[in-house]
Amino acid sequence: MSIIIGIDHGYYAIKTAHCSFPAGLTSYGEHEPYTRQGLLEFGGCFFVCGSGRQPIQRDKTVNDNYYLLTLAAIAKEIQQRGLPPECSVRIAAGLPLTSFGRDKPKFKDYLLRSNQPVNYKFEGVEYSLSLIHI
């Protein structure tokens, strides 16, 4: 199954057609936090998505934060649509207009990493996704 998900990667919030959450991310390393809400498990580490807000990053590819927030947004959108957690995803990514032309190719490569499928857990549900187009 292949689906299209539009994601606006804003400085303040991550937005899809059916959800919006603050663009904050807290890392707990290898220690599971007290909450399951917004909990992302990826690469052996725990992150809480939507907690607070990050400082504005002119280049959103300098660390993994926006990649991890993208995985959370995909999981939330799949859950809202009632779709299976194993699928191929085409992302329609939104960037700020001021940097769209400059950052588009770099952001596309950033999201389309070579490790496919992407396996992770979000709020206790296991996902196995192939990101096939940005």
List the model feature ranges, each with a label.
Residues M1-I132:
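Nucleotide/phosphate-binding catalytic cleft detector across ATP-hydrolyzing
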